[in-house]
Amino acid sequence: LEKPKYRCPACRVPYCSVACFRKHKEQCNPETRPVEKKIRSALPTKTVKPVENKDDDDSIADFLNSDEEEDRVSLQNLKNLGESATLRSLLLNPHLRQLMVNLDQGEDKAKLMRAYMQEPLFVEFADCCLGIVEPSQNEES
């Protein structure tokens, strides 16, 4: 087994590849981490009032600081994602773009991710991203 590099968006269980994620999502239970949920819900939430001329830099910084180092994509891999012709081609699809907007703006992102991972177009997009980020991982399915 490889060291897990990713976490399930629903239950935060670590997984190492697309194949492992597919196996996991069949039996995923978002309530597998109730203690962590209770702790997080007990913590005070930070509210940020929108300010004019304020970029998304703060929210990006919060996001980057929110997860463990192992969950982050390297700058080189981000660059590779941006330069991928296949990924750019997929992102021209208006349906995929709408799914991405809905996911970005949605309240329950884990629920949306579970639903979208049933959509072949979104799975193709996710597989493409993972293939770029983890080029050494060959699909086992």
Swiss-Prot record:
Residues carrying Phosphoserine: S66
TM helices/strands, residue ranges: none
Protein localization: Cytoplasm; Nucleus
Example of a GO cellular component annotation carried by this entry: pre-snoRNP complex
Predominant location: cytoplasm
Listed GO MF terms: zinc ion binding
Matching Pfam families: zf-HIT, ZNHIT3_C
Assembly notes: Thyroid receptor interacting proteins (TRIPs) specifically interact with the ligand binding domain of the thyroid receptor (TR). Requires the presence of thyroid hormone for its interaction. Interacts with NUFIP1. Interacts (via HIT-type zinc finger) with the RUVBL1/RUVBL2 complex in the presence of ADP.
Name of the molecule in the record: Zinc finger HIT domain-containing protein 3
Designated gene of the protein: ZNHIT3
